Structure formats: C-alpha cells, structure tokens
C-alpha cells in the first residue's frame, strides 16, 4: 500500500533503531561539545512502562487508611530506612521515599528533586496501551495524533540537527516523538547504529557506501518524495559514522551501576548529550512495573518489603538517575539539565491477594535537576477515604499531567504549551 511523506517519516524513524535509515544531520558545529552554552536546555524523559505503584514510591506512611488498605505492602516509618540505615522520610512532610530511592533522597535533600503527587487525567483509562498513548500525545480523547514532544519538534527543530531529539535504547520510537516534519532517530545500541554493509573487507565496504551514495543521488533527483527517501538513507550513512566519531570522544569519571538497564540507557544518553551539543531532547524507557503479584518479597521471605520487583526497579531508577546526573555535572551540564519521569497510571489503593496491586489512577511524577525548585512536594495526595474514592475504588487525581508538560514546555523549553497541548494548563512552581 502506498504511503505518504508523513507516514514515511514516522515509519523511517523506527527503522533507525536497526541502523538502516536516518535523517539529515550532523552539521560540523553540532558534533563538538565545545564551551558550554549557558542557554542550552536539555530535557531527558524517563518512561516507567507498566504502571508504577506511586503509593509505595512517595509513601504517605502517616495515613491510617494507607496502612489499613495495604496490611502487607504498607511501609511504616520504621521501614523507611536505606540499607545503610539512613531515613528516607521527607523532612517534616508526612511522606517518605521508598528505601530503594536512597540516591533520589540525596538529590531531594540537595533541592534537586520535585515529587509531584496526584497526577492523572479525567476519566482515566486503565488500559496500558491507551493510557500510554494519552500520556505520549497529551490527548485524553483516546491518545490519537502526534506526540507532545513531536509537536514541539515540528515547531522548534525543523531544519536543525536531527540529533536534536533522540530516543535511546528502546526497540521502537516512542509515540511521544511522533511528528509531521521531523524524523527522530531511535538508537537501540551504538554498535548497531551504522549503515549495514559487508564488514569483512574495509575496501569493499567503502565501495558499497560510495555506490549507495552515487546511485541514490543520481536516480532520485527527479522525484521530490523519493528524494526524501534517498536523502534520508544517504545522510544516514554519513550521520551514523559521524555519531560513532562523536561518542568515541566521550569519557567520564562516573561509574554507572552494572546490571541496571536504565543506567545503561542513561549512559548512552550521556554519551550523546555530552558530545553532541545539538542533542537536547532525549528519551529512555524502563519496563516491568505492572506488579499484579509479588510486588514485594522473594522465595525466602515473601513479605519482605525491602526486596522484590518494585524494590529492584526503584533502585534502577534511583541509581541510574544519580549516576547520570553526576555524569552530566562532571561535564559542566548540570545547570542545563531537567529530567522528567512518567508512567501511564498508578495502582489501586488496596493490595490484592497476591502481594501485588492492580491498575489504578492517580500517580507520582518526578522532575529532577539543578534548575528545579526541589526539596519540596508539589501537587496534593488524593484522599484514600472510602467516600473520596471513585466508583471503582480508585483515587481521584488532583493534578492534570498536562500541567507538568505545560510547565516544562513554557518554562524550560520556551515553547507555547497551549498550541502543543491543545489548551491552557496551570504552570506549577517547580521551574522558573
């Protein structure tokens, strides 16, 4: 079936992950980092795919309803200590971080982390795919259309380096980056991000590349749409090689934690952001948050809240973000960086019979960085009282997630959030 240029742009972005197609990029001034531009604004988005349990992330440990609804899963104040015995209670606030968030607590105490409570949207959809699409697009009427950062790219990044926005480490391009005018590359690994030719003979590889260049440039000059395809492939061959050259110059005093998939993705993100000055929108995802069972515990102690799937994943997030923050700081970019986390929905207030939680509504987001007015909580924890829950027994959201997006668009990226989000949403005080 024939496709139009708009469809091609979106499909080709996915092909980039296997090193076949990439848009025009890499002007020479975009490769070298050079002196730090004080006006550079970097946004890194971290998706927690599957629906994180927000109530056991930023924990309302003083709430008697929280304790009664979760007789096995609930944390008491005495539980809110790291492995080193450091409290994760958030000062005088009636909340504490999960003990696995030790590094995030350190950043919070330094004023660099803003937890945002009660995040959601009207008539929440509890399907993973539909709710993810809603967060990707900021369209609560079914999640159709381009992504919210794709719309930003169409407004601000046309004609700029195509590494201005990059998805890192995933299998396919996140819908957040779907756009009409800009192709966003999806780099699953640096090793695979090359134009694929026979690697056994360097001379033959060069011949293949030269033939690809000359044939495609010659054959597709007459047709504007086919020329888009040819240009994309030809410039992809050039750009993939240039990317390898750029990241070869990366070095860091920071050791990222081993066996941590998010840390691995964030290290790739740092390699791009610290060596390519045009790379300012970056995206990485970590899955596995759908804990209908065995959210806590292991075979030896099934009710131990300090081990288990949720503990492990939160540790990945905390350790990964801290290593990435330290890396960016070591490269002089801490003042240029904002990190935002999101997940498609929260979990139900009550635990189930399998030491897990089922799909819920209101949840927690984090915004991290030197420009963030952190060290305090934003938003309002939804009431857990029976009469305050919705008809399905879920929490009622208190803050529209699009307000978080609007704040970042308006106060960090210098965009018009109303045109991107399709309406006006309250800016929150964590930036600006």
Where are the regions a protein language model picked out?
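Feature for exported/extracytoplasmic and membrane-associated proteins, marking the mature portion
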Residues: 1-331, 350, 367-368, 376-432
């Amino acid at each position: 079936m024939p496709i139009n240029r708009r469809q091609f742009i979106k499909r080709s972005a996915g092909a980039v992950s296997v090193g076949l197609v990439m848009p025009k990029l890499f002007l020479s001034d975009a490769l070298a980092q050079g002196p730090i531009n004080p006006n550079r604004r970097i946004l890194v988005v971290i998706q927690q795919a599957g629906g994180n349990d927000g109530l056991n992330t930023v924990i309302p440990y003083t709430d008697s309803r929280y304790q009664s609804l979760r007789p096995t899963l609930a944390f008491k104040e005495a539980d809110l200590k790291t492995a080193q015995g450091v409290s994760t209670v958030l000062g005088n606030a009636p909340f504490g971080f999960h003990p696995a968030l030790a590094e995030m607590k350190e950043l919070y105490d330094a004023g660099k982390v803003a937890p945002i409570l009660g995040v959601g949207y009207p008539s929440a959809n509890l399907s993973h795919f539909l709710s993810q699409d809603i967060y990707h697009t900021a369209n609560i009427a079914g999640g159709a259309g381009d992504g919210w950062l794709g719309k930003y790219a169409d407004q601000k990044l046309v004609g700029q380096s195509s590494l201005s926005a990059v998805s890192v480490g995933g299998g396919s391009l996140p819908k957040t980056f779907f756009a009409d005018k800009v192709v966003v590359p999806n780099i699953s690994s640096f090793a695979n991000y090359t134009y694929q030719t026979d690697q056994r003979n360097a001379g033959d590889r060069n011949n293949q590349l030269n033939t690809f260049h000359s044939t495609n440039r010659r054959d597709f000059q007459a047709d504007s749409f086919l020329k888009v395809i040819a240009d994309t492939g030809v410039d992809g061959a050039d750009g993939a090689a240039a990317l390898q050259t750029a990241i070869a110059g990366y070095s860091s005093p920071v050791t990222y934690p081993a066996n941590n998939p998010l840390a691995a993705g964030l290290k790739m993100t740092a390699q791009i952001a610290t060596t390519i000055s045009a790379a300012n929108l970056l995206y990485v995802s970590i899955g596995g948050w759908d804990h209908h069972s065995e959210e806590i515990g292991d075979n030896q102690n099934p009710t131990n809240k300090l081990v288990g799937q949720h503990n492990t994943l939160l540790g990945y997030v905390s350790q990964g973000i801290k290593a990435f923050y330290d890396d960016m700081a070591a490269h002089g970019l801490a003042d240029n960086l904002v990190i935002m986390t999101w997940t498609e929905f929260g979990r139900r207030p009550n635990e189930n019979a399998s030491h897990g939680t089922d799909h819920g509504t209101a949840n927690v987001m984090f915004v991290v960085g030197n420009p963030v007015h952190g060290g305090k909580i934003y938003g309002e924890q939804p009431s857990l009282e029976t009469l305050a829950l919705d008809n399905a027994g879920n929490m009622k959201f208190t803050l529209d997630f699009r307000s978080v997006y609007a704040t970042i668009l308006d106060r960090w990226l210098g965009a018009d959030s109303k045109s991107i989000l399709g309406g006006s949403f309250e800016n929150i005080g964590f930036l600006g």
